[in-house]
Amino acid sequence: MDDVAIVSFNDSVIALEHFSYNKDNYALIISDLRMPNLNGLELLKKVKKLNPTVRTILLSAYEVDNDAIFQQYMKEGIIDSFMEKPVTISDLCQRVRDEFQVYQLASYVK
């Protein structure tokens, strides 16, 4: 993970616009569920349409296991990983490493 750059946005619409112009430069997107304009589910669905190989982590402080849309997005691979907040830095770093490993393995298979 030496060549990793972190880009942060506080507006999901601007984040999506940026991603649409740079979609091949991303391996991982981390999003919160509750955001103004586009929520995390909507954002990650649009991200996966632009680049199906990008890995996604959804964060939320809310119970989502019983949410039908959440379950469907997990089955469809729109959400690759879910973490319930509060999240520790060490847990988040480990999950990021795991998702990068999956991304790299998938890149070798191509």
What are these regions (language model features)?
Residues S8-L28:
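Acidic, metal-coordinating helix/loop segments flanking the phosphotransfer/catalytic sites
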Residues L59-A61:
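Hydrophobic/aromatic residues positioned on beta-strands within the core alpha/beta folds
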Residues E84-V96, F100, Q104, Y108:
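C-terminal output helix
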Residues M35:
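Receiver (REC) domain active-site loop signature in two-component systems and cognate sites
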Residues E42, E63-S81, S90, Q94:
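Alpha4 helix (beta4-alpha4-beta5 surface) of REC/receiver domains from two-component response regulators
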Residues M1-V7:
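Two-component/phosphorelay signaling modules centered on CheY-like receiver
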Residues E17, L41-T53:
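Short amphipathic alpha-helix used as the core "switch/output" element in two-component signaling
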Residues D32:
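Active-site residues of response regulator receiver
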